A protein has these predicted regions:
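N-terminal regions of ATP-driven nucleic-acid and macromolecular assemblies
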Residues: 1-140
């Protein structure tokens, strides 16, 4: 696995659950982050690239060619590539357990949206920790 351009990502869970030596981290890929991502895509199974905005088709073409030529799945965070097969979005919609200035987070609701070229868009709410006292009706 490779991680490009995400210096504030905590690898503590990876260290507890697995072998950190199998993760290649490039927190600051320099002036050509997509070149770094392309090279990693040629030899790894999964590459995560964090960036901003949208990559133009001209700039994306060499990276996508390396993804197609290799065996990697490319997961982008915060940046959009032309020809994306599946797009996943998430947003925290509720936090439970925290009062004004005090308390502990006891539960979090995250709305997840998925859009794919081959299926209609869908969304749902993922609850981590304590559930809501009274379930609310949701149309998904």
């Amino acid at each position: 696995m490779g991680i490009v351009g995400w210096p504030d990502l905590s690898l503590a869970q990876v260290a507890e659950e697995g072998d950190v030596s199998r993760v290649i981290v490039v927190p600051d890929p320099g002036a050509e982050p997509w070149a770094v991502t392309g090279v990693l895509c040629e030899g790894l199974d999964l590459v995560v690239h964090k960036g901003l905005g949208e990559l133009s088709p001209t700039r994306a073409r060499p990276v996508l060619a390396k993804v197609r030529g290799g065996q990697a799945a490319l997961l982008t965070v915060g940046v959009r590539l032309p020809g994306t097969v599946t797009e996943i979005g998430a947003e925290v919609v509720a936090v439970r357990g925290v009062g004004r200035g005090s308390g502990r987070i006891r539960g979090v609701d995250i709305e997840v949206r998925v859009a794919s070229k081959s299926a209609r868009p869908c969304r749902g709410v993922l609850t981590c920790g304590e559930r809501r006292a009274r379930p609310r009706l949701e149309v998904v």
